[in-house]
Amino acid sequence: MSGLPRVGTGVDVHQLVAGRPCWVAGLLWEGEAAGPEGHSDGDVAAHACCDALFAAAGLGDLGAHFGTARPEFAGASGARLLAEAARLVREAGFEIGNVSVQVVGNRPKVGRRRAEAQAALSRACGAPVSVAGTTTDALGLTGRGEGIAAIATALVVPR
């Protein structure tokens, strides 16, 4: 394995379900009418970060590590999954440089709690995580409010 940095991309999408708690970017968004459906808490930002880390390290994907066949992760927080993903990446011989995640959806508006979200995900990851948000201008499942998505990029460096 060369000592060159490696980059991975992760994507996660969840349906929004009325009455479900809205966990996004390691935070509970009180007052949201719907939250992401999922085996765990459905935190698309944390899940995309996990997938980006796994991809960068060549360790598979979120489903391989935390999928529905693993009952111990049912209802798990995205922060818990991200902390475990970071541990596995380090155990495989990598240091985490940083992770960047973009949340795609109409709600919640991540910009108003960006610093808090970055702190929560960075704490879980043990490395800097930047958080941004965007919409699809009313197009597609996120634009219609049917779902929420996230896209992440991670940089890891072999030790």
Curated annotation (Swiss-Prot):
Gene3D superfamilies: 2-C-methyl-D-erythritol 2,4-cyclodiphosphate synthase (3.30.1330.50). Keywords: Isoprene biosynthesis, Lyase, Metal-binding. The record marks H39, T135 as: Transition state stabilizer. A divalent metal cation binds at D12, H14, H47. Disulfide bonds: none annotated. 4-CDP-2-C-methyl-D-erythritol 2-phosphate binds at D12, V13, H14, H39, S40, D61, L62, G63, T134, T135, T136, D137, R144. It holds the Pfam family YgbB. PROSITE patterns: ISPF. GO terms for molecular function: 2-C-methyl-D-erythritol 2,4-cyclodiphosphate synthase activity; metal ion binding. This is 2-C-methyl-D-erythritol 2,4-cyclodiphosphate synthase. It comes from Kineococcus radiotolerans (strain ATCC BAA-149 / DSM 14245 / SRS30216).
